[in-house]
Amino acid sequence: MSYIEEIYGREILDSRGNPTVEVEVLLEDGSMGRAAVPSGASTGAFEAVELRDGDKGRFLGKGVLQAVANVNEVIAPELEGLNPFDQPAIDRELIALDGTENKGKLGANAILGVSLANAKAAAECVGLPLYQYLGGVNAKELPVPMMNILNGGQHADNNVDIQEFMIMPVGAKSFAEALQMGTEVYHSLKAVLKEKSLATAIGDEGGFAPSLESNADALLAIMDAIQRAGYTPGKDIALALDVAATELYRDGKYHLEGEGLTKTADEMIAYYEDLVEKYPIVSIEDGLSEEDWEGWKKLTEKLGSKIQLVGDDLFVTNPARLARGIKEKCANSILIKLNQIGTLTETLDAIEMAKRAGYTTVISHRSGETEDVTMAHVAVAVNAGQIKTGAPARTERVAKYNELLRIEEELGETGVYPGHEALGR
């Protein structure tokens, strides 16, 4: 048995040039785990708190020296000497040290960094890749990628209201083939946009962010790109949306400012029904606001048997909010973001609860990412079946895809790529 010898936190930069927390956990035998914490742009009101310094004279107030100090001065002395293999006990200790509902005292960024680095140190100590350490012999399902290839909303400076237009290579036979298909469509989309004299600058997650007239224009451009790449929309490559509707919600209405429209929840649902009828859309994330439980119930009644309805801001990876959603029959899928709840154990608990209720799970990055690939391992460890980690561009996104290629190679014939089945409908 090797115990925790040292825990060390530092401030590094994420993909948006903002500071974030990185933590190293060192064990007595020399094993070391390192984890860097991501950060979101469109954040749910019910997420665990990311601690920022607020000192405007340093990184425009976005420094994380306080969170780093909490790792080094508060957490480290309490955890050093403990058993790293008892992840639930480590995470319980972290939660108790913080003592708040939302991890606002020490910061979810400090807590998650320690939680993940600890699991990675333990995995290294026993000579296992993280996915196998967490998931055992049953960890064998590669996730279908949801590739965000066209951006609007909070992730881009343009007039498209829907935040993410994604492609899912559901017709692929392996993860490697899925990555190839998605990448070919991505390059094809660039050519389509260039022909229309539209911008091919990329957003936070690697997707293009052209100024289009409407959401329908975005969908048509992607359909064109899929066909030009030699694939059949729906059969080979399906479409998925992240509306991030909480960002559009004010005074009980949804404001689609790019299109100059204001809609009620019922009108939004009718709008989605129309889109699903016209395009091969298999998944809609955050179609309604995180506060609009009644609307979510109706949306699920109308579309829940046809497509995947993913709760992100609605659930914020929180078992208590997920339990309410299950009880009230809201959504049929949960987006899992490690930093929304703040510890690995709570994340795994949320995934377990979702699976028991028949909800699908999608492991997700944040718009502010790092080269850390922990989420790729978590996706395989829990057989999530789906991963959302951006376009096949920008190293912090591609790092996750490349790690999944390595994992698929390592799994060999035991590895499974679920394709259409990942959606569970």
Curated annotation (Swiss-Prot):
Pathway: Carbohydrate degradation; glycolysis; pyruvate from D-glyceraldehyde 3-phosphate: step 4/5
EC nos: 4.2.1.11
Active site: residue positions: E205, K337
GO biological process: glycolytic process
One Gene Ontology MF term: phosphopyruvate hydratase activity
Catalytic activity: (2R)-2-phosphoglycerate = phosphoenolpyruvate + H2O
Cell compartments where the protein resides: Cytoplasm; Secreted; Cell surface
Keyword list, A-Z: Cytoplasm, Glycolysis, Lyase, Magnesium, Metal-binding, Secreted
Gene3D superfamilies found in the cross-reference section: Enolase-like C-terminal domain, Enolase-like, N-terminal domain
Domain of life: Bacteria
UniProt xrefs under PANTHER family: ENOLASE
Family: Belongs to the enolase family.
Protein name in the entry: Enolase 2
Gene name for this UniProt entry: eno2
